[in-house]
């Protein structure tokens, strides 16, 4: 490339090149690397940073460093060339790549790409990814051309050079057009700086590197345009001399057509199609089937709309309008025109919709896919949240589900066997990995006969200093816990949220590095203890089964012990069970309660029966989420046909997502679960309402709903349903994590329950053992039959220690007759729970640490004490999270504060000077 550059211009650019790169390296290695970059790299080691974020981080460090190294190498090459004295004149010697070419051809495009990707874009779209790939291809083409331009090149290489330079020329022109919008504001800012320069002398050393970096970034698009235009023209002329003008020009046109076609194709955003497809409710099975065939397109479109704030950062942005209106004083019409033009130019980065589409997408997703979008698209949303250079903001937006904020440092399980039953104690130690107070949450399940008997919190392992629980009404306990979390005070709450489901929450886990405890010299930790009693089941002691955890995680470094003995590392929270001593056969037990005795009798395999001569109603959940469990549904119906229908009768009710009444099928043989259409969203209450609309006059021995694990967050508060038959929920694929209180009350009041398979339900319904007159059956569960007797059984050993389990079975039975508006009945049940220190559907355990919390609990117990709200109807929304504010500024914040004070000082001095000038001006009547 031949250029006619004056020595003065070359010297000025050389000075600019070195000043810019030295300033940029100063900013990067003093400001960017110690603060932002190190946070990103540390998170990357934990797997919390997408690879697309790591590339620009390394690029911002490596590009100016490499460019500076190339500049130094070029200087050395020039010195060597100047020292060469050829014996004969051989013509001009090939010159090394110029600083202009290094800066605008290599450094500028890569630096701009890294800056835009890291600071302005989060989750990449197909269009933005295509532009970055195009920029990389064009830069590689120029680099190859610069390295080989003095050598004979193959025809194929020349054509590729022309293609790459053509693409890069278009991109340079595109960036130059964007930069034009900043020309007038830049002139105004520079003019103001010149006007105030006399007052900025002291601040010049501080702001000079930033001024140089900013000036260089603004100059880059035009310098790139000039360089790539000259390189493109030279390559085009070279090929035209070899092949004529027509072929190279046709090649340029083809490259442009293909490139623009691909860009336009990738700019098509999928949310428009998704919204159109879901605009009207389908009225027939054929229409539903057609929508299901487009499920992938609908998923992509709704996800794109939901993540619009992450994928399209310029969504409804008014920055250019404010810049021209406020800074330049332009009329509103002019500022609006500039804003519209700016948005048009940035179409590849703009969202084709409005900010309300996010909520619309979340609602439509839940209605179509039968699960909250934050669950269904967890990994994609998590990746978008983590694609942020600001790690504090990224971590604040992390979904609590699966988030790794609090490490389980230690876990101790202690089992104290007492023959057929045992007391199990779980002790855990939590270490926060963040610098904010953090809540942990477990959803877990226990055997239905297991009974939780204690909960404690502590700041150390000293049992004498731990905070003890109180048994409180479920609504009052929830209210106090929620209020105390808002006040950043330590509480813990353990609730029963299903027949065998529990929710455990503890707050706050102390921030990492905090050490407020005297004389221990260790970072603060939180200790938690939980105890429960459980009957032996299949010669095993059953441990809690984790359904979901939030914020808590464990690693191979987590210390685990069982009865004081170290255990092997595990990826699971707890083992499913621990082998029990089988030397003694199971025997009956009894415990005394006020008003009678509760007897637990072990059952043998032959004691279990199947129904005979009964009439059942089977309700089938036909929502979209059941598609993942279609095989289990087919197996369940096959079992019913093989084992139940010959001796019993049944009606089938098929639910519908359109909200109409269920479809009744009189014969189960006529239903093929492999062909039924599974569509839309259905909750338990909706399906039962549809059933009741059709089956008002039917008398059934039991109502069985075949569903999946459900979505607790999509349920609504309500009242129990007045069903005439016991309600049993069969959760194919696993139990639901939690139930709303209305559904739980419906199950309890009808004498139903939940299970994970149809066989368990049928055997529990049919197995009705008896101990004779004066006794009544309470429950058949976990290998035991529980009875209530008015007198003690002389042949059965009385064990007062099993009274908590006996009280739990008694409460489960009397719950069938309890009305939710009868506080005296609920208070009586709660009193039994308090006397036996147990968790029940009506009574929760709350750990309180100060008198104020106890006073608040007493106030809460005086009013709406048993009404509990549905938790997390919407999961934590990362777009609503706000980065926490630290009480002590970080180093980067000190720099920002210094800059703010400097600006205020300059403004004050400028205002004083202007007032002085105005004061010295003569009055108007004297002019």
Please tell me what each predicted stretch does.
Residues 410-425, 429-434, 446, 517-521:
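Short, solvent-exposed beta-strand/turn "edge" segments of beta-rich domains on protein surfaces
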Residues 562-617, 624-635, 642-643:
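Acidic, polar low-complexity linker/tail segments
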Residues 2-405, 451, 463-464, 702-705, ...:
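Pro/Ser/Thr/Gly-rich intrinsically disordered low-complexity regions
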Residues 373-399, 441-485, 554-573:
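Solvent-exposed beta-hairpin/edge-strand motifs
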